[in-house]
Each structure stands twice: as structure tokens, then as C-alpha cells.
């Protein structure tokens, strides 16, 4: 984009601009004609599963292989009797429902019916303790994602409701949950798209005050979205990437937010350039050339952050990034070609009714942002202290942080499957909602052995086990399956923590029963959620480190500085903690959610860091440009004044588009939308205009260390004066101060690096077969760096005659990493997020 020849080729005239616009429209149309519908290739099942190599998935595969017919998806009908004789009412209703589902007119996909009528021996498992409620199990064949399967579930529900009479009846279970999930999502994309378009259009009209200019970003986003969706559908159909309904929803708001941001940046610079260059084609070329570096850095950061998700082993994260990275890459190409070309093609009418002159004058950036810049220049210490204090207060919401793995509680709309699970919880106990499947595989045949019964007896005495169903023998005679009902909510953290001890208890029971070298696996929803939690913990740690590394490298390359990326990344981390704290307080403490969705935290971090750094990139890039003509203090003031309006408008639009996700009836999307809106507003109106300029103002010439601002290029050249007699002494004092400041900077970098190593070591010590060596090494180095840092802070403060406030801020910054490390350790132990070492005496043999 820095090539003038390329810009002249694309934007040299109206005819060339028309060719560019026609090219994109043609590409969008051609791809739409050959690509399948995105909905037809969406995969919503794998996103909620643990890694394929996890124990729970191995257990599921064994159930399908060893128990023929058990791979059907069950619908569970809950019947609760009414009246004085609830037991009789429930029995009559179950008989009528069983008859309707067992006849020749039963719905398609229904394999069989298991109830007290067809299986009276199973009454102990199908009838509640007070006999007022009963269960009817209806295995259904086919894929829950097929429309015919969902229609069959609806028919089962209609028949059950019709034949139940006065009894309370609900259809739940995996089949009911899958059908309700599809219904909750159905139509959501259209509502989301419409709400986003209307909201963005209103904001753009308020910003541009021109209807045609407001339509330009929307048309660009529409073209980019069409191209990205069709390319994504083609790649998903070929099995190259995975696309889910949630990913598609986030793609919509992401492209609207990012696309309008890029459009605002480019068109604002275009209006500003028109003040000096009346030729619109040359002005647009100059605008694109001057914004290319920052916009490309922004897009590259987002794309690389999305690709960083590929290191994840959990399907929910692994398949999330490529599709979004594709969309942002397409949006960046459209922003640099389609948007400038369309603006040129529309000519002077694009600024109607205000005209070019008023549009150009609005780009001067006077008004409130000049006053804010002046405030930061007058009192940088007070401004920085106030912002940091507010962010710390918001971070306190993390005290109520907890995660939720319950899919049904994540629906913000009432569903029949959730009502059914509520009935099961009340009448049969919480564990009956989702039994765990314990699998014991032996090298010997167990058909005639008493071991399976002995193991079942032993399991009834295990912690948190309510009951154990009769063992089922696999067709190979070597594999035994036990349905184990826990006395805990199967979606709670305590239930997830109980899976490990249950496996150990089964291993001990198998050895006591004489089954040597047995392979023990735990399946079911609770075990799957435990494996998902372990995978997410591992993935989140890797993704955090990788995304921070990516952002740091991009900032180093863009700003040619080693120090600036450190304090910019620190502001992003502080913003993330404040955002997550505010989200936890609002959704969990105030709204009463079970917890933060198990994947939401990782999503928030990746998106907030990748998008939040954009505004830092925009203002710091302008700061670098202003340094060519002004000293640092005036340069940061000018950068904030010139970019304040456009970046704030961009942030407002981006926050608004993500806030639209709060209209979706899914907890994860609601929480993610709230968090992103909150975090982007913090970045836009606190961190970017106040905290970052205050830090730059405090650092002065060292803000871009080791780069030093050159002599500003001013029209007048000051006359030289003869050196004074004190010049050698002044130079010596300056050299000593520079060395001290250089040492101060390097020890800050060392402290940050040793802190990162300490966090990694703390995580690794929780993994089996690892030691605490990393914690000891990096802990010692970090402690030494901390002491040296505080000492140098005092020396620098004395040497430069700092005030107490500035000295206190820098000293407190050194205390933040140790405090966060301790908080991390306490939080990890409280929540149990980090994997705990297993206590198995020997490794589990492979099947």
C-alpha cells in the first residue's frame, strides 16, 4: 500500500475507481453463485465437545462400539402426576404415552420406548421415590442436526403432551436439548444483522452528517461479509475450517465494527488531506498512504491473534479463529480498495449536504479533545492515577468469578428441555439429569467373572455416588459399563472435580476384584465437561502468552521501540482484568447467571487485546508522525487532538456492534457482547485518551525508547549560540542520568520477562510429571529484579527531582506483578481451574 504507482493505478481517476468497485461486486456475485449456504455447513456439535483424545471421548467411542444400539440419541420424557393420587396419575399418563409411541403410527426416528410398561424390572430407575413421577426413555436414531430429526422430536412432544392428560410432562434429554438449541438460534442471525445495520447507520449519520458517506462503510461491510461468508462456506464444505452458529454471529458484529473503524480512519484522513490538496484523487491516495501502516498493523494483529487459536486442543477454540481471520483479512482488502474507490466515484455528492469545506474543517480536531489533551498535559500523574484506580475497582468484580458448563442454563429463553431437567432434579435428584458412564476394560474375559458385580458394589461406597446401575457387558466380553449417578449437580465444579477421584476409586475397585491392568475411562456429560475444563485451562494459558507475544512484536515493528510495547501491553492487561471483573459483577452477581460461560474468558481476552490495541496503534502512529515537526509533549497533545474524534467514533461503533450480541438468547453471546462493549468503551474513553497519553507525557523523550525523537523540522532555524563554560559538566551530568534511565528501563523489561516466566512456571507445576523448578528459578530472578527496580526508582526520582506522586506510581507498578501472581495462585486454588496432579500409582494402559 506504500507504492504510489499502485495507488495511482487503483485510485488515479473515477474510471479506475469504477473498475475497482465493479471488481468487488463481481467477485461477491460469482462466489455467491458457487458457494453452498453457510447454514448448511455449520457444525454446532463439535464445538461443545472435549478433544478427541480425551478419556470421555474414548469412553463414548467404546459405548458405541461395544453396546449395539446404544449410540441412539435419547429423548427423556418426564411425567409428574397431578391431584391427590399423583402416582396413579403418572402411571396412567406413562401408559398412554408408551402406547402412542410404540404403535405403527409412531414418529420417524423413534427406535424404541423404555418405560415401566415395557420394562417393569427397571422401575427402580424410572420411578421417583414418592412414585409421583416417572421417566420414559425414547432412543431416537439419526443426526440431531437434521431437520427431520428435530421434527420427530416435536412430534414426540406433541404426542406426550396430548396423551399425558392433567399430568405435567416435558421432553428433555440429549434429543430435546439439541432441538431446543436449534430453535433458540433460529432467526437470531437475521435479527442480529438487522439490529447491527440500523444501529451502525444511526451512529454513522450522526458522525458524518451525510447520508451517502454514512452508506459507504455499510456497503463495504456488506461486500466484505458476502465474500468472507462464501469463502468460509466453501472452505467449511471442503473440511478445511469449522464454522459454528456462534462464530457466524460474532463474524457479523466483528466485520461491522472493524469495517466501519477502518472506513472512519481512512475517510477522516481524506477529509483532513483535502485542506491542503484540492485534487480528490491525489488527496485520497495520500490519505490511504498515511493510514496504511496503522490500519495494516491493526488488521495483522487481529488476524494473527485469530490464528493463535489454532494452538488450542479444545474444538471450541481451535475452530474459532480461521473463519474470523479470513473475514478480517477480506475486510482490510475491501477497506483499502473498495472504500476509497467508492468515495471517489461518488464525487462531491458524498459530502452532501454539508459540502467538502465543512467536512474538511471538522477534521481539524478542535473542541473537547483539545481540552482533554490539555488536561493530560497539565496533570499526567493525577490522570494516570485516577484511571488506574478506576480500573482496579472494576477488577474487584473478579472476586465473584466462577464458570458454568451447563448448556441449558445458558439459554435466556424458556425451553421445554430446561423445564424437564428441573422436574428431574426435583423428583429424582440432581445427578439423574446426566449420569456418568464408568468403563472398565480388562485383558481377560469377564462374562463368567464375579468382578463386574464386585466393582459395582465397591463403587456405591465411592464419594459423591448416589447409586450405581447394574453393569452392562460389552460384546467383546472384556468391557463393562456402569451408569453412575452422582449426588451433585452434574454441571457444577464439585461434580467436575469428582471425576478424578471416581476414576481412582474404580481403578482400586478393579484391582481389589482381581482385574489387573484394567483400563478405566469415565464418560458422560460431567466427564466431558471436566475434560473441556482441563483443555481450556491449558489452551487459555498458551493463547494468552502467544497473543501477548504477537501484539508485542507488532508494536515493536510498528513503533521501532522496545519500551512502548511494554506499557501499551500493560494497559491492555489492566483493561482486560477490569472488563472481566465488570462482566462478572453484572452477569453473575447482578443478573444471577450460573457463571461465566466456560469459553467466554478466552474469547474476551483474544478479542479485547486484538481490538483494543488498535486504538493504541492509531494514536501512537499519529504520535510518531507528529514527532517529525513537534517535541514529544506537543506531539502527543496534537495526536490526541487530531485522532480523538475519529477514534472515539470508531470505538463507539465497535462497542455498539458488539453490544448487539446482548440481544441473542444465549448466555455466552450475551456475556461476550457485554464484555466487549464494556472493554472497548474503557479502551476508547479512558485508556487511549487518558492513560496512554499520560504515560507518554511522563516518559517524555523516552516514550519510544530506544528510538529518540529527532530535532523537529520547523520553518525557522534557531541561531546557534556559543557553548557555555559549564557545557562539559552539563554533558557529564546528562550522560550519568541517561545511563541511570537506561538501567531503569532495562530492569523494568527484565522484571516483566521474569514475571512471565514465573506465571508459566506456576502453571507447569500443576501438570503431572513436572516440578517446581521453573517457579524457583524465575521466582528468584523476579524477586531480585523487583528489589533492583524499586531501588532504581528511588535513585531516578532523586536524580530527576520527581514529585512523590510520580515516584509512588512507578514503585506501585513494580508491585503489580507480584500481587497479580499471588492473586493468580489464590484464584487457581479456589476455582480449581488448573489441572491437578493425578495420584494413580501406575499409568493407565492403552486399549
UniProtKB/Swiss-Prot annotation:
Sorted UniProt keywords: Cell membrane, Membrane, Transmembrane, Transmembrane helix
Entry superkingdom: Bacteria
Any one cellular-component term (Gene Ontology): plasma membrane
Topology term for the membrane: Multi-pass membrane protein
Matching Pfam families: DUF3817, MMPL
Keyword Cell membrane attached: yes
Keyword Membrane: yes
InterPro entries referenced in this protein's UniProt entry, alphabetically: DUF3817_TM, MMPL_dom, Mycobact_MmpL, SSD
Renumbered residue ranges of the record's region Disordered: 708-729
NCBIfam families xref list: integ_memb_HG (TIGR03954)
Similarity-based family: Belongs to the resistance-nodulation-cell division (RND) (TC 2.A.6) family. MmpL subfamily.
Name under which the protein is recorded: Putative membrane protein SCO5905
UniProt organism field: Streptomyces coelicolor (strain ATCC BAA-471 / A3(2) / M145)
Source species taxonomy: Bacteria, Bacillati, Actinomycetota, Actinomycetes, Kitasatosporales
